[in-house]
Amino acid sequence: MEARELGSPTPTYHLLPKANQHTVKEDASSPSQGSPETMQLKKEISLLNGVSLVVGNMIGSGIFVSPKGVLKYTASYGLSLVVWAIGGLFSVVGALCYAELGTTITKSGASYAYILEAFGGFIAFIRLWVSLLIVEPTSQAIIAITFANYIIKPSFPTCDPPYVACRLLAAACVCLLTFVNCAYVKWGTRVQDTFTYAKVLALIAIIIMGLVKLCQGHTEHFQDAFKGSSWNVGDLSLALYSALFSYSGWDTLNFVTEEIKNPERNLPLAIGISMPIVTLIYILTNVAYYTVLNIQDVHKSDAVAVTFADQTFGMFSWTIPIAVALSCFGGLNASIFASSRLFFVGSREGHLPNLLSMIHIERFTPVPALLFNCTMTLIYLVVKDVFLLINYFSFSYWFFVGLSVVGQLYLRWKEPDWPRPLKLSLFFPIVFCICSLFLVAVPLFSDTINSLIGIGIALSGVPVYFMGVYLPEARRPLFIRKVLATVTRVTQKLCFCVLTELDVAEEKNVERKTD
């Protein structure tokens, strides 16, 4: 709702004189405290929007492009389908644990917020630092480049698309989606809904074609489905890693908990609806691929869905590359939507500059956080070998996800009286913690160098925490304080935004952690 539509006078907000100020001054003409128009993110995400966010972020380009990663390490159709099922089951358990955490700690920010409540600011800051520096911008840059490649590739069938053209189109995609999410939250959710429907329909088309082929008697690839299976523990671990990469994104809704309507009901319900849908679609899509393609075809393919379409869709085979591009577009939108809220919450907790916790005074969108996220992604689009950076955060990703669930167990013991609308059996978080420990250990042994680089990136946040969070503001470098104050004032003027107000209703159940 825009401010001019309200019956009460429009508040006039004064610019902050200093970057460290935590309140927003209003004129006497501003609404009273009883006014419903408070300066905070609005609850605009419905159950359907939540399902679209989770499904849309989980179903990216992975299921279209990289099923061969699982098949490569399992060496048989039967075992690969088992690994896909295990990956889905593991993701369901993790999502259920996050559903309990999200309904207990009703803050946005996902694992950052949960680690903050359980273990304090330092570890939470390191989690935020890794996401800010490598995880979010790298992931979004890769998705945007994949989108651009699939859009441009049909114009260059005999060679690779021009490097500059791909990067420029990727940058345009990131900027467009950032604008959409800056404009209105509803615009972002509508884009998400639309592109989620499109990618699901594309996968249903693949599944139907595969089932038709099965009904026509093409069952030869399943007659001895486990023949040649690799039972090596290392290979199975890498196969599971490949499957879990495609399942990543099940925690998307936990990044935006504060914007969900009735989160105690809709958060676990959206997760409960989304996870079986994605797991079933993934398994059936792989069955369709394996019905038509032999193992050699899958190994040689750069995009399994495109190879499948070339052999089955005939003159309509061009639709699948478009579907992959649309899938990337929707996945990028969900990632931008979620990661901007992570930076927003980090700023609100004092771990990032205050300007990132500002929202537009009429549109109620976190414009500075969205622009910061966009800037970081554009910087990584300039890096030529950006795809190599993804190897650095597998270790840290599973470490912090697992640590969040360890925090769930810790809070069960430390705060047994906290209201928990959803309370799981301890079996689920314990199993997830054990599996997460395994997933942390695998890259340490199989990809030691990249894992150590990832640890180094995380540890680089220690001096930043000391200088920017731990030290009292008066002892921080004067130059940095002046720069932040200037940038904050300019941001307010350009983006027409102010600091948010704390939601007392959200804060009353969970005491805010401070160091």
From Swiss-Prot:
Chain's role: Heterodimer with SLC3A2, that functions as an antiporter which operates as an efflux routeby exporting cationic amino acids such as L-arginine from inside the cells in exchange with neutral amino acids like L-leucine, L-glutamine and isoleucine, plus sodium ions and may participate in nitric oxide synthesis. Also exchanges L-arginine with L-lysine in a sodium-independent manner. The transport mechanism is electroneutral and operates with a stoichiometry of 1: 1.
Domain of life: Eukaryota
Keyword match Transport: yes
Gene Ontology MF, one: L-arginine transmembrane transporter activity
A single GO BP: ornithine transport
Topological type in the membrane: Multi-pass membrane protein
Organism: Rattus norvegicus
InterPro entries: AA/rel_permease1 (IPR002293), AminoAcid_Transporter (IPR050598)
Family under the similarity heading: Belongs to the amino acid-polyamine-organocation (APC) superfamily. L-type amino acid transporter (LAT) (TC 2.A.3.8) family.
Keywords from the named record: Amino-acid transport, Cell membrane, Membrane, Transmembrane, Transmembrane helix, Transport
PANTHER family: AMINO ACID TRANSPORTER (PTHR11785), Y+L AMINO ACID TRANSPORTER 2 (PTHR11785:SF398)
Catalytic reaction equation(s): L-lysine(out) + L-arginine(in) = L-lysine(in) + L-arginine(out); L-leucine(out) + L-arginine(in) + Na(+)(out) = L-leucine(in) + L-arginine(out) + Na(+)(in); L-glutamine(out) + L-arginine(in) + Na(+)(out) = L-glutamine(in) + L-arginine(out) + Na(+)(in); L-histidine(out) + L-arginine(in) + Na(+)(out) = L-histidine(in) + L-arginine(out) + Na(+)(in)
Organ and tissue specificity: Expressed in cerebral cortical astrocytes.
Record protein name field: Y+L amino acid transporter 2
A single Gene Ontology CC term: plasma membrane
